[in-house]
Amino acid sequence: MRTFVRIVEAGSLSAAARQLATTQATVSRRLQSLETMLGVRLILRTTHTTRLTDDGERCYQHARRVIDSWLALEDEVGQTEDEPVGVLRVRAPHAFGQDQLLKPVTEFLQRYPQLSIEWMLNDRSADFLGDNLDCAIRVGVEVDPATVSVLLAEVPRSVVASPALLARFPAVTTPEDLQQFPWIAISSFYQRHVELFHDASPATARIAITPRLSTDSLYVARNTALTGLGVAVVSSWTVQDDIQEGRLVHLLPEWQPAALPVHLVYPWSRYYPARLRRFLELMRQVMPEVTGMRKPVQQP
């Protein structure tokens, strides 16, 4: 049954075999045994795809509940102190996942010796079933109603440009002046316009921009801004030293882009294992203190 569930959630027999550390032939035999025992075809297979039959869909829903219940029993009976065990599969953004979050994650693993973590860096939205993920740390607004999103922190942002670029244009004194510049867009967060908020009044400004370069990488945006290619909106922590040392200029500091929310996201379930619950507790505790983040501003 667990093999069948893993096939469904991994998306193919070969992917399930890799995750289970076994051969595709073994996975296929287990699936055939389950289908023979139930007397129905659960998965339709072609050379390139697999898909659930109607019976397979019903079987998967029941099997998922049975496995969740069994895991809950294991936690309750086998771990009297609710200590996390097993493997936690986490997706984190490149910018934070390769640096600032490593220390708390390492300490977390040292605290729980029976736990392992698969720490995968990717800035795309999480496909929990296809990638077999337990949770994901996401920067930006989450709108998937099938998931639980826990707000952990927020990331302040700044508008920056190089002195060489600024020397080619009239001085910037209002948000509208930014429209004259070439731009570097971070496609995950802004592409054709930038919205700014005044820090001492309710005033807002929506600026149309013309990107010379669009990227999904925060580091690419920062590095190309340093070359003078264009103006960019970036996470403030990535350019703090550049601003202090004069490599970049913080434009209109009284006008700020909205800070980006940081969530821990995971699929809704009737049961959450101790490893996920403890990791959520850790992230709630450490995330607002991570370099470049702050506690979320309470909304009115």
Predicted regions mapped to residue ranges:
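A short LG(V/I)-centered, amphipathic sequence patch enriched
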Residues: 35-52, 248
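The DNA-contacting recognition helix of HTH DNA-binding domains
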Residues: 24-25, 98
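C-terminal regulatory
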Residues: 127-130, 142-262, 289-300
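Central regulatory/effector-binding core of bacterial HTH transcription factors
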Residues: 85-148, 296-300
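Short helix-boundary/capping micro-motifs
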Residues: 6-21
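Short helix-loop hinge/linker segments at domain boundaries
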Residues: 47-50, 54-57, 68-91, 297
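A bilobed periplasmic-binding-protein/Venus flytrap-type ligand-binding module shared by bacterial periplasmic
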Residues: 262-272
